[in-house]
Amino acid sequence: MKILLLYPPYTSHIEEEKKGYFPPLGLAYIAAILRSHNHSVRIIDMNVETKNLEELEKICEKEQPDIVGISSTTITYNTCINILKRIKNVIPSAIRIVGGPHASILPQEFVDYSDFVVVGEGEYTMLELVKTLENGENPSNIEGLVFKKDGKTVETGPRPLITGLDNLPFPARDLLPMEAYNDNKGAILTSRGCPFNCIFCNSHLIFGKKFRARSPKNVVDEIEHLVKKYNVQVIRILDDMFTLNRKRVIEICDEILNRGLNIGWELTNGTRVDKVDKELLEKMHEAGCYRIYYGIESGSKKVLKMLRKDIKLDQVRRVVKWTKEIGIEVGGFFMIGGPGETIETLKETEKFIEELNLDYVHLSIATPYPRTDFWNWVLKNGRFVTNDYSKFEKEFVFETPDFPWEQRMKIFEYLHEKYCFNE
């Protein structure tokens, strides 16, 4: 079948350049597995290909895909719905399938605008669905779907998480404009799932809490593929919890060294300070690791407890010191304005950032994603000031009686201007 996969733009006005943007690996994984079964696949990443919705309509009219798949996030929800409506008008015969984080968490918000919603990991669900549609068979027995049938919503039940990640083909990067992504940098996912319990995270709602990892050989095979095919010199590891399995990290490092791969790599998505030690950091540095971001979140013990981070400030101090001494650049992720936050706790965070003297500081607006415990905390302790998903991550969408959203925003902007010049 002829399949078009879309990654919607994060902004309404698409920038000519998206420096620092990452390729949509989720769609590239799905494209790879579909193509391995002889389906014709095209990916359009609207963040870098500067395709507005009118251009997208023209592409759909010209190519007439049998299936259009869209990956959804919370902040692209409105755009996704708009695209689904337009596709229905332009090519009524096309089957519209939605997946991704937001669709997995709230499939009911898409079911009236699409033919199928894929819930959770999409590779095998999508493959099975495409085969079923091609053969004109009943999709009701495919796990991981939500759809309408005879006016009623059908939920086929959850699909088990993928255990053999090594069996997945490498992402179909050749279907993406790789030159648009960070020049000589490549992105990779080596594991899925995180067993921790942070109040703000929604990753476990899609990938589960069980840590599932690719083998060191498989990981380094992909790194070598990126080096040889795309002349990549820097690898950005996007895992939620890369250092959870210490033995595996060391084996990955040894594999890189044994193959003589002269590359740099970084933990772009962060890791935990309680899941590294000095010896491990030294090994990582030897194998080319030049930058690590740590999920620190706050300089307040009270806020860390509310966030359920289960880390101590002294741990942060010690690990940051080790990392810098070894010669690895250190970045810190901080979440501003979340549960338990006050003017005083934000002053503690500001003081802690100053003390740590990090190479990079990334501040994020505390965002209560649907179905997270943070979302439920807001319902109990405050109120949402908007139901417009497009404002999530860009401004505070909630407030509490003692801390209005405008005040949170003002403090965030002050801290961001002060510390985030080098992101």
What are these regions (language model features)?
Residues E109-M126, L281-I292, E348-L363:
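Structural recognition of alpha->loop->beta junctions
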Residues L4, P9-E16, I142, V146-T190, ...:
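N-terminal [4Fe-4S]-dependent radical SAM core
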